[in-house]
Amino acid sequence: MLVQFMVKNVLSFKEETVLDMTAIKAYKEHECNLIDIGMKEKFLRVAAIYGANASGKSNLYMAMSLFQRIIMESLNNVGEGEKNAIDRYYVPFSFEKTEENSEFQIVEIYGGYEYKYGFEYNAECIVTEWMY
């Protein structure tokens, strides 16, 4: 189950941006929209992403897709002269030239355990990767 998705320095997201599926008590949540898995927090079944035109809604979806593609395709061997998945899917912040690395992180709950997986990368390589 998805708990959080974080993206930084990708597409239109310069700063760290987090989609968080943790229910908060500040809103009047309907119980039917919450998932209680016996942990401290409850989680949302669905989330609506809305905003003005050009506010990043589609880019959040694209960032999730880039994250998935990098993971899936980085295992494939590429032919000589072809771009690898890291180079092909490196799309840093679009509105200014930056040398900063891009970053993804996902937090999931599976089998009652919380897992965090993420990596920081640039056009050449994965700089750091973590899972705990």
Predicted region positions:
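P-loop NTPase switch/coupling surface
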Residues: 1-132
